[in-house]
């Protein structure tokens, strides 16, 4: 195959375009303080699983499906049936799939070698010299990036004001470590490098004689070799573009990594030239799936079809009888899968308790400042920009916050003193005895963490009445809650209480940007209790009964305890309702804890659950969203009483009330995308923990205040820690792509997909599965790609299956 050499005076756009594509192939990672789940395959959404597998095998040496023995075990136990295998086989391209079921089963019994990435110049230099150049550059770059990206943790703060490339050059020209290891003249090489990152990239590519076709996957490989540091730089680009700007940090990191490649090539080029020529050709070749990768994709599809069969069986069960009487209480929870267990427990206590599911930020994208804080917390999905600003309110004067500010400053100063370059060495000896009491208290798990209880939040600046009415109406319509209001309506955000857990924010509400959801719930409750807003809603045809009280709550997913913010809206007429609600919530918590205890290691019963949240040695305080496999948007009556085992996102939706299908469009473009990020993060952290997992919690050290490394340095580890998906013996997350089930007309769903190419790509390329439910709640149609649908029919034979075209 002929490849296009880079001209001596190449158009800079060639390099810029390739660098930009490589950067967008990297998933972003949010800092620990507000970490959220991210789809690690975000940059491969336009490819099928098999093709993405080929790409990631080339650039990172990872497999993005499970080892074949995992599927073989499911085949042996009958969990994956022959019908599942046949259906998945029929969907695969004929030129790559096994010829028949027997051949597929024979392939499933084999264990092909795991993929190997193409060698970098550093890899080839290591083989030629015996020096671990990949390890050395990882160590040196990791140490520098920890300082450069530091958010206040480093002993010595890195100089500010320079680009990443400029800051690195200032350090690298004085770092003799590479030269001591054998890379003579490295500091001078760096000092003589071009002044801009793009000029560096152009020079290195020319010197390495890279064909134009090789640039994208080679650049992708270089950024993947930086681990979480590259992902954090991608986050900076994401945030900048969300605000309408741009950021060059990830391009700078690419240039830095390429300077190492160039220096090593100049040093060892004579010894590695032939091997490097083969690598160049391999990078320039088109990315295509191999028969082995297609077999893996077929087996993955079959495992998902088996799970979908089980989901269809559960949903086809008898629906509960709908009570026409007014509910005693309604409770709206986040769609988070952890709410499913609690909602089912709560509804079991009284048939007149009704629960609903809605995105946990309750439709209010607020940038919030807590009491006495100058930090603006983005309490909304990371896909959005803030639409509102809020702050902790209450009947206090501005000067009342000053003592809290002084206390916070003193705490920060004390923290800096503990970490300072000089004082840190004497800190333990000088102040250690002061901490004896705290150490004993923490070791015994004595502190009982309380729910956040700032003064009730308020919008600042306040919205005018018309805007408040519009916002309230939009939220209620999106919740499909426009009639049939109970006397007491609870709006329950969720959060988690854990100790000694750098990933604590990952247990909070993803829809709230990695924060707990009480602020959004309290803001909405205040909005819906406003008499003027209610009067305005009545004029629009949405009448809320005068005796309905909205009350915010916070569901602690670690302990299944619920805090009611009753003091926000004192109401003597509802004291009995609130007291009864507290009793029901406490009883539901006990039931939910009992069910969750069955899955948690060393959890004897429901009473042991609370202790886990206060145990600083506990690496698994809760399973969070491990096990998630389905997203269901339908009336609650379709899923009520059906045990979905805490594995389904549940969003209330009544398409008959959605005349323009604007709510359907909102669901497909927001909650479904957030759920897909969560599902695919768990998937990636399970199938490829070396690239997309957070590593071992027992080895974690927080670095820069933004992430964790294993040990004392190296690559930032992004993704979920191993303890979040595995209990030490078995996987607690089953890596399955999310099955999205919508009760809505097929034509309406297709119309929405036709308007949103990015959403459609996720379904067309198989990163998500899509189904419709009928009016009985049973799965009726499967999306077949290309805006085509096929009916679900258990009697479907192999000939009919051969017509299916869903991507694998």
UniProtKB/Swiss-Prot annotation:
Keywords: Cell inner membrane, Cell membrane, Membrane, Metal-binding, Transport, Zinc. It is a peripheral membrane protein. Pfam families: DabA (PF10070). Forms a complex with DabB. Transmembrane segments: none annotated. Part of an energy-coupled inorganic carbon pump. Its cofactor is Zn(2+). Disulfide bonds: none annotated. Zn(2+) binds at residues 334, 336, 494, 509. HAMAP family: DabA (MF_01871). This is Probable inorganic carbon transporter subunit DabA. GO terms for molecular function: zinc ion binding. The keyword Acyltransferase does not apply. The keyword Zinc applies. One of its GO terms (cellular component) is plasma membrane. It is found in: Cell inner membrane. Belongs to the inorganic carbon transporter (TC 9.A.2) DabA family.
């Amino acid at each position: 195959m002929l490849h296009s050499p880079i001209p001596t005076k190449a158009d800079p756009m060639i390099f810029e375009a390739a660098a930009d594509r490589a950067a967008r192939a990297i998933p972003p990672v949010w800092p620990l303080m507000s970490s959220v789940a991210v789809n690690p395959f975000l940059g491969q959404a336009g490819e099928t699983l098999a093709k993405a597998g080929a790409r990631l095998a080339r650039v990172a040496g990872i497999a993005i499906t499970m080892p074949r023995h995992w599927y073989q075990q499911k085949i042996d136990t009958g969990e994956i049936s022959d019908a599942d295998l046949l259906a998945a086989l029929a969907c695969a391209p004929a030129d790559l799939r096994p010829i028949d079921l027997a051949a597929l089963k024979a392939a499933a019994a084999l264990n092909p070698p795991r993929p190997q990435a193409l060698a970098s110049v550093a890899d080839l230099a290591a083989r030629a010299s015996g020096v671990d150049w990949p390890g050395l550059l990882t160590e040196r770059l990791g140490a520098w990036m920890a300082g450069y990206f530091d958010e206040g943790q480093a002993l010595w703060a890195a100089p500010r004001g320079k680009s990443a490339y400029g800051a690195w050059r200032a350090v690298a020209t004085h770092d003799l470590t590479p030269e001591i290891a054998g890379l003579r003249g490295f500091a001078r090489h760096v000092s003589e490098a071009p002044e801009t990152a793009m000029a560096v990239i152009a020079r290195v590519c020319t010197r390495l004689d890279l064909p134009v076709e090789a640039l994208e996957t080679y650049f992708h490989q270089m950024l993947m070799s930086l681990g979480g540091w590259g992902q954090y730089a991608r986050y900076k680009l994401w945030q900048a573009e969300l605000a309408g700007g741009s950021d060059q940090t990830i391009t700078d990191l690419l240039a830095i990594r390429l300077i190492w490649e160039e220096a090593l090539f100049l040093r060892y080029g004579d010894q590695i030239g032939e091997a490097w020529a083969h690598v160049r050709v391999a990078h320039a070749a088109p990315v295509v799936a191999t028969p082995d990768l297609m077999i893996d994709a077929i087996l993955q599809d079959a495992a998902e079809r088996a799970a979908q069969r089980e989901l269809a069986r559960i949903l086809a069960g008898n629906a509960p009888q709908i009570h026409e009487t007014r509910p005693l209480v309604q409770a709206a929870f986040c769609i988070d899968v952890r709410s499913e267990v609690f909602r089912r427990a709560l509804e079991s206590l009284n048939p007149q308790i009704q629960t609903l599911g809605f995105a946990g930020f309750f439709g209010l994208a607020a940038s919030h400042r807590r009491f006495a804080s100058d930090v603006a917390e983005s309490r909304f999905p990371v896909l959005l920009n803030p639409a509102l600003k809020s702050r902790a309110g209450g009947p206090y004067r501005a000067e009342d916050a000053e003592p809290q500010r002084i206390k916070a400053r003193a705490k920060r100063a004390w923290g800096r003193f503990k970490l300072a370059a000089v004082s840190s060495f004497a800190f333990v000896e000088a102040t250690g005895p002061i901490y004896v009491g705290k150490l004993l208290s923490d070791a015994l798990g004595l502190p009982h963490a309380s729910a956040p209880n700032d003064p009730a939040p308020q919008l600042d600046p306040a919205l005018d009445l018309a805007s408040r009415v519009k916002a309230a109406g939009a939220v209620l319509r999106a919740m499909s809650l426009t009639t049939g209001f109970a006397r007491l309506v609870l709006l329950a955000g969720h959060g988690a209480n854990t100790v000694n857990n750098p990933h604590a924010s990952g247990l909070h509400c993803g829809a709230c940007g990695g924060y707990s959801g009480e602020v959004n719930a309290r803001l909405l409750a205040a909005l819906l209790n406003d008499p003027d807003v209610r009067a305005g809603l009545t004029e629009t045809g949405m009448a809320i009964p005068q005796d309905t009280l909205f009350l915010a709550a916070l569901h602690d997913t670690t302990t299944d305890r619920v805090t009611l913010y009753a003091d926000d809206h004192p109401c003597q007429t509802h004291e009995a309702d609130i007291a009864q609600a507290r009793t029901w919530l406490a009883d539901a918590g006990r039931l939910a804890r009992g069910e969750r205890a069955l899955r948690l290691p060393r959890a004897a019963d429901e009473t042991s659950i609370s202790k886990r949240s206060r145990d600083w040695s506990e690496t698994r305080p809760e399973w969070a969203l491990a096990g998630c496999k389905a997203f269901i948007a339908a009336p609650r009556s379709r899923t009520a009483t059906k045990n979905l085992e805490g594995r389904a996102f549940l969003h209330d939706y009544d398409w008959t009330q959605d005349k323009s299908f604007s709510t359907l469009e909102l669901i497909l473009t927001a909650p479904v995308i957030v759920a897909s990020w969560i599902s695919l993060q768990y998937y990636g952290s399970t199938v490829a923990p070396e690239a997309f997992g957070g590593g071992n919690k027992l080895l974690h050290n927080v670095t820069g205040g933004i992430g964790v490394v294993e040990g004392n340095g190296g690559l930032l580890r992004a993704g979920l820690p191993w303890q979040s998906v595995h209990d030490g013996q078995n996987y607690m997350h089953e890596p399955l792509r999310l099955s999205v089930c919508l009760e809505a007309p097929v034509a309406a769903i297709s119309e929405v997909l036709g308007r949103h190419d990015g959403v459609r790509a996720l379904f067309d390329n198989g990163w998500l599965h899509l189904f419709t439910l009928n009016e009985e709640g049973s799965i009726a149609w499967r999306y077949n790609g290309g805006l085509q649908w096929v009916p679900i029919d258990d009697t479907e034979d192999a000939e009919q299956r051969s017509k299916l075209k869903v991507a694998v």
